[in-house]
Amino acid sequence: YGKSKLMIENVLEDYATAYDFNYTALRYFNAAGSFEGLGYQLDPKEHIIPIIVGKALTGEKLTINGNDYETADGTCERDYTHVVDIASAHMAALNYLFDGGTGGSFNIGGGSSSSIDTVVAEVEKQLELTIDKEYGPRRDGVPAKTSANIAKAWDEMGWESSFTIQDIVRDEIAYQQSLIKK
């Protein structure tokens, strides 16, 4: 996945050089959350925040893959990005290009990482319950931590994240609860 994205960025860069073409490539870090009743639906779910919220709402046991990573609490840390922040990054990228920006690749993230255990604790806090959880083995090839350096997005496009992990969890809970009510 990462290699194919890098290949496309390289093609864009070569094309831009050859044909005097400006572009932006946005690198999203862990899209999450929902907006006005629109959310992320996969079956089976593949992203951790919808999984955690779903398990909390159904009372099913949550399995966290690995608690022996080189992080503060032993669980993976990820930089989660609210879908509205991603939308605003697209607008900033368009405005940047329309205003004469030269283009390039930009990291789009929340600017800080949250561990899986931190996300679980936030879901528990907002739902006022305790999630039945267990720790399983690590998944192969999963890095301990990812975090977006969004300095270039701010410096060149004037973009920064507006939503926190608390906002992301709140919106994901509201979205999944709306599905239950239907």
Predicted regions and their residues:
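Short capping/connector residues at structural and topological boundaries
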Residues: 1, 6, 37, 53-54, ...
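Active-site Tyr-X1-5-Lys
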Residues: 1-32, 51-58
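Short-chain dehydrogenase/reductase
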Residues: 1-6, 42-50, 79-80, 84, ...
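Short, function-defining helix-loop hinge/capping sites that tune catalysis or transport
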Residues: 13, 35-38, 157
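Short alpha-helix within the catalytic core of nucleotide-sugar-dependent glycosyltransferases
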Residues: 13, 49, 87, 91
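Flexible, glycine-rich beta-alpha linker
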Residues: 21-45, 71-75
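Mobile, glycine-enriched helix-loop/loop "lid" segments at the mouths of ligand-binding/catalytic clefts
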Residues: 36-63
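C-terminal substrate-binding subdomain of Rossmann-fold SDR/epimerase-dehydratase oxidoreductases
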Residues: 56-182
